[in-house]
């Protein structure tokens, strides 16, 4: 009888990918990146082991938002003090803090447990075209579709 292969944490090979977010839809990019971070594009994917790769996203400020999301999609946060509810539209976040916009979108697509927090640490988002990971020799990743 054969048993299902399960990857061990020590035998996983990790690559570094760099993705240019210029003009790409936020949701399409986020779902692809979440899949890479989890390792679902690898044949040795194991749900409870971190088999994913590192991802660098550049030009986050040039991400595309379809429809009226720039004005109608609202992100809320609360300071836990009375009257401390603050809100921002997706368009404001894209201009003021584009890294946070992408991170929130990708984080929502990862597991909500300790593995998800570990996977999220492998994501590096930059608003401009420069990044500080040249020593890792990242490959350019072409998005599907």
From Swiss-Prot:
One of its GO terms (cellular component) is cytosolic large ribosomal subunit. GO terms for biological process: negative regulation of translation; translation. The keyword Ribonucleoprotein applies. Gene3D superfamilies: Ribosomal protein L13. Keywords: Ribonucleoprotein, Ribosomal protein. GO terms for molecular function: mRNA binding; structural constituent of ribosome. Pfam families: Ribosomal_L13 (PF00572). The keyword Cytoplasm does not apply. InterPro entries: Ribosomal_uL13, Ribosomal_uL13_bac-type, Ribosomal_uL13_CS, Ribosomal_uL13_sf. This protein is one of the early assembly proteins of the 50S ribosomal subunit, although it is not seen to bind rRNA by itself. It is important during the early stages of 50S assembly. Part of the 50S ribosomal subunit. PANTHER family: LARGE RIBOSOMAL SUBUNIT PROTEIN UL13M, RIBOSOMAL PROTEIN L13. Belongs to the universal ribosomal protein uL13 family. This is Large ribosomal subunit protein uL13. The lineage of its organism: Bacteria, Bacillati, Bacillota, Bacilli, Bacillales. The gene is rplM.
């Amino acid at each position: 009888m054969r048993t299902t292969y399960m990857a061990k944490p020590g035998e996983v090979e990790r690559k570094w990918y760099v993705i240019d977010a210029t003009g790409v839809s936020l949701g399409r990019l986020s779902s692809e990146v979440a899949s890479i971070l989890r390792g679902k594009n690898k044949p040795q994917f194991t749900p409870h082991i971190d088999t994913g790769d590192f991802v660098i996203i550049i030009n986050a400020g040039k991400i595309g938002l379809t429809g009226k999301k720039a004005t109608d999609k609202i992100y809320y946060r609360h300071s836990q003090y009375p009257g401390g509810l603050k809100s921002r539209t997706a368009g404001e976040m894209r201009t003021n803090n584009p890294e946070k916009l992408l991170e929130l979108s990708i984080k929502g697509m990862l597991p909500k447990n300790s593995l998800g927090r570990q996977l999220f640490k492998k994501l590096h988002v930059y608003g401009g075209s420069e990044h500080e990971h040249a020593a890792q020799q990242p490959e350019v990743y072409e998005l599907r579709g």
